[in-house]
Amino acid sequence: MIRNFNTQVGGVEFEFMTQHVIKLHGFQVYVMHEAVKIRFHMQVNKKGNFLITDRNSCPAPYLEFEPYLSEAILNSQKKAE
């Protein structure tokens, strides 16, 4: 079962909400930016990495965190097994 989780990257707290409880496929990601809770989506690609699906919906300072957020998703699910 795929689980929701929180993690910190670069001192910033990210909340991951799964969009599929059986298959590791996509997440809604929430982050506080300038006192506003922002949502963007990450989805798995053919190589098994998670990418931000709409880079315009993710605050620019966090775009560089994409590989770390992908790694956090993969590691969180290994821990849940």
Which residues does each PLM region occupy?
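Acidic, low-complexity intrinsically disordered segments
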Residues: 37-81
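Negatively charged, low-complexity tracts enriched in Asp/Glu with abundant Ser/Thr
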Residues: 1-22
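Intrinsic-disorder/low-complexity loop/linker signature
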Residues: 9-11, 35, 48
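Exposed beta-strand and adjacent loop surfaces of beta-rich binding modules
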Residues: 2-4, 26, 39
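Short, surface-exposed, low-complexity cationic segments
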Residues: 22-34
